[in-house]
Design a protein with these regions (language model features):
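Hydrophobic anchor at the start of a short beta-strand
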Residues: 2, 101, 278
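Glycine-rich FAD pyrophosphate-binding loop
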Residues: 2-17
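Active-site substrate-recognition segment that forms the wall
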Residues: 22, 54, 58, 62-70, ...
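Dinucleotide-binding Rossmann-like beta1-alpha1 core, especially the glycine-rich loop
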Residues: 25-106
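General small-molecule cofactor/ligand-binding pocket signal
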Residues: 68, 102-105, 149-151, 281-283
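Helical element adjacent to the flavin cofactor pocket in flavoenzyme catalytic cores
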Residues: 84-95, 116-178, 182
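Mid-domain beta-loop-alpha active-site segment that forms a flexible
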Residues: 110, 123-140, 263-267, 315, ...
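Conserved mid-domain beta->alpha element of the FAD-binding
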Residues: 303-324
Length: 324
């Protein structure tokens, strides 16, 4: 029997609060993986990420998860240097990894995205976006139907390792043959050697009021997800009820940035000045865990204690793959 110990509620953390972008690949560039593990293993890892995207779509279909999946993701360049790097990346992924990204110049991008801020885009038709909390809850429902036991509000306070590891909570314990640690930024002392490998980073997102279908689709005509390539990036997409969801800003503090709603609204207006009469109706945030090089970190602590963390903002598809 599989038992899940959840410190809060299903989807309380990054799995429910994230921006909803499901992207093939990882938080680092492929050349980082090549330096870490070699070209052959880097190719294998990239193919794993493609498999993770296929797995995500199959799970949505198999379990009839109503999470508003939409195809298409664009990584956009603001500065000429970024434009050159993105275009070279499109060529490299096609030639060396057999991955068919599309390069859009400024005019081609402008046909789909009503913003003059960007110089070009790498468009990935295989990636896309979804409602993250609906997806997380759908996976939980499928797990329950398969016989998994889920205990919410059950934070683990101690992991006792051994032939049969034990996880203690404030109200009881679970003894298991195998343990998977998937707490990301919230391990809270149960595996210090893992916590030292990642850093929690706050990221924030807001939603406008419903704009109406015509106005919303005038912003992103093909309904793709979009992200720029800055370190503290902007990312955005449309929701099923025709809101613009606009995220970005990074915080390395335990507190959200002051004046967050105003800051996020100004960032949105910088991309879409035609929304100068629109503010963000809701703003929320949460913490992702990133590694120093943004490469994912998963493996085993002991022969029967596994871990998966450090997805660095690219966990929607690749976490499912890591679990598999």
């Amino acid at each position: 029997r599989v038992t899940v110990l959840e410190a809060e509620r299903i989807g309380w953390g990054a799995s429910g609060r994230n921006g909803g972008q499901a992207i093939v690949g990882y938080g680092c560039e492929q050349d980082v993986l090549e330096r870490l593990v070699g070209e052959g293993e880097a190719r294998l890892l990239f193919d794993f990420s493609r498999d993770g995207m296929t797995m995500l779509k199959r799970r949505i279909e198999r379990h009839a998860i109503a999470c508003d999946w939409r195809d298409g993701y664009a990584s956009v360049a603001i500065r000429p240097r970024q434009e050159r790097a993105l275009r070279a990346w499109v060529d490299e992924m096609g030639q060396r990894y057999d991955y068919p990204l599309q390069w859009w110049n400024r005019d081609q991008l402008r046909q789909q995205l009503a913003s003059d801020r960007y110089l070009g885009a790498a468009f990935d038709p295989a990636s896309g976006h979804l409602h993250p909390l609906a997806y997380a809850n759908g996976l939980a429902a499928a797990a329950l139907a398969a016989g998994v036991v889920i205990h919410e509000h059950s934070p683990v306070v101690e992991l006792r390792r051994g032939a049969r590891p034990q996880l203690r909570t404030a109200h009881g314990s679970v003894t298991a043959d195998f343990v998977v640690l998937a707490g990301n930024a919230w391990l809270r002392g149960i595996a210090p050697e893992l916590e030292s490998r990642v850093m929690p980073v706050g990221t924030y997102i807001g939603a406008t009021m419903p704009l109406g279908e015509e106005r919303a689709r005038s912003l992103i005509r093909n309904d793709m997800a979009v992200s720029d390539v800055n370190w503290a990036l902007d990312y955005f997409r449309l929701s099923r009820d025709h809101r613009l969801l606009f995220g970005g800003r990074a915080s390395y503090s335990a507190l959200p940035p002051p004046g967050l709603r105003g800051v996020m609204t100004r960032r949105m207006h910088r991309v879409f000045p035609q929304l100068c009469d629109v503010a963000l109706e809701y703003v929320w945030g949460g913490y992702i865990d990133i590694t120093r090089n943004r490469a994912p970190h998963w493996g085993r602590l002991t022969p029967n204690v596994y871990f998966a963390q450090g997805f660095s903002g690219h966990g929607v598809a690749s976490t499912g793959l890591a679990g598999e």
